[in-house]
């Protein structure tokens, strides 16, 4: 009898281990925040992403777009809010000295042209969670005021909790990878993607973690178009308003996995209180 019990217990243990291995890790196929569309997107990737399946644009088509530079190398995207403030993702600035950061504006290339402006200070959302990538927002105050032109303009912000209906077409832009691999783009690119309902996005990412109320998803069910590493912190714009900040995702442009963005309307009051915008 004791041998039968031992065999039964061993079978149960093997079954449990096999089941655990068959289910995706909730946090490890995330893209690292800074890898995540910083780097790997999902891995709850937050590193940087490059637009996959998109098209090249001139910066005048997205004059609010900036390249966030870390020691003179492109790290993330960002959006101009006014002549002193830029919004990006918290995973793009966390733990970095502002003196090591600068933003390039008014150029279709992240490595040259336009204007390079230093960052005076960063204000990350106090509730940012690097494990869940929740509240993935960071404000950057610039060292000098910007001069607006056809190539440099602020983006309009939504009202607090202003809704975005599922299926709304939005444009994501950046210099991130043009494939899930590590091939990045020197020239600004964009892609048009439909927003996805909170319910459908939650179902897609059920094994990777919660899609919170501070998140907005966009992408095609069949994949093919998405933000990618290097695009983190960059803009998702719908009807002329900044509705999302590139945050994380599973790979890039993978079927069944829309891109996950920080939902700007959810922190509209925080942006106003900390930047005056």
UniProtKB/Swiss-Prot annotation:
Induction: By blood meal.
Active site: 91, 136, 232
Superkingdom in the source lineage: Eukaryota
Main location: secreted
Paired cysteines (S-S): 76-92, 201-217, 228-252
GO cellular component assignments: extracellular region
Annotated tissue distribution: Midgut.
GO BP annotation list: digestion; proteolysis
Domain Peptidase S1: 51-276
EC identifiers of the protein: 3.4.21.4
Proregion positions: 20-50
GO molecular function: serine-type endopeptidase activity
PROSITE patterns, A to Z: TRYPSIN_DOM (PS50240), TRYPSIN_HIS (PS00134), TRYPSIN_SER (PS00135)
Leader sequence residues: 1-19
Reactions catalysed, as given in the entry: Preferential cleavage: Arg-|-Xaa, Lys-|-Xaa
Annotated site residues (Required for specificity) in this chain: 226
Subcellular location: Secreted
Keywords recorded for this protein, A-Z: Digestion, Disulfide bond, Hydrolase, Protease, Secreted, Serine protease, Signal, Zymogen
Stored InterPro entries: Peptidase_S1, Peptidase_S1_PA, Peptidase_S1_PA_chymotrypsin, Peptidase_S1A, Trypsin_dom, TRYPSIN_HIS, TRYPSIN_SER
Function according to Swiss-Prot or TrEMBL: Major function may be to aid in digestion of the blood meal.
Protein family: Belongs to the peptidase S1 family.
Name the UniProt record assigns to this protein: Trypsin-2
Species annotation: Anopheles gambiae
Gene (UniProt): TRYP2
